[in-house]
Every structure is written in structure tokens, then in C-alpha cells.
Amino acid sequence: MEAVERIENPYGIRLRIFLQPKASRDQIVGLHDSELKIAITAPPVDGAANAHLLKYLSKLFKVPKSSIVLEKGELQRHKQLFVPEPKLIPKEIEALL
């Protein structure tokens, strides 16, 4: 499975992510094995990293954070998310489609 996959029905983007919490800044780092590595500033405590990741992705894709679905990996660094009907696709992610 690819790190970034375009889904047709329902339309959206599925992301396989390797999350790096407690980074110095929020950013898409690049590919890490077969996953998209994303660094965020939030610590991995009490769901703070997941909440921060959803907020960061909602800003990148211009969608409500409540619409992003965390499909796998709630308590792990390896995650799978679905972003339905993104209004904008960041250039780092567009390059992987």
C-alpha cells in the first residue's frame, strides 16, 4: 500500500503516516519506508498528539478536523487516516499521488 492514496468512492485521500511527536515544528518531513513522515510539536500524552495531528491536517487540506477519520493506530506512531473531500492538497502530498 502506498503512503498516499486517492480514493474515488467516497472521494478523499488515505494517508499512511509515521508520526514524530515532540518535534521542534509541525511539518511534513517526507517518506519513511512506505509511510509519510509527519513531525508535530505535541507530546504523545493523553491523545494530545492525535488531536494536534488532526488539527494540522485539517489546516493543510482545508477541511473540518471532525471530518478526518483516524482509521488505524490511535495508540501507535504508525497511523492510517482518511481525509474526505479535501479542498486543497499540499504540494508535498500531491507529489506522491
From Swiss-Prot:
SUPFAM superfamilies in UniProt: YggU-like (SSF69786)
Taxonomic superkingdom: Bacteria
Signal peptide feature range: none
InterPro entries for the chain: DUF167 (IPR003746), YggU-like_sf (IPR036591)
Pfam families given in the database record: DUF167
GO CC annotations on file: cytoplasm
Matches recorded under SMART domains: DUF167
Similarity section: Belongs to the UPF0235 family.
Name used for this protein in its record: UPF0235 protein APP7_1431
Source taxonomy: Bacteria, Pseudomonadati, Pseudomonadota, Gammaproteobacteria, Pasteurellales
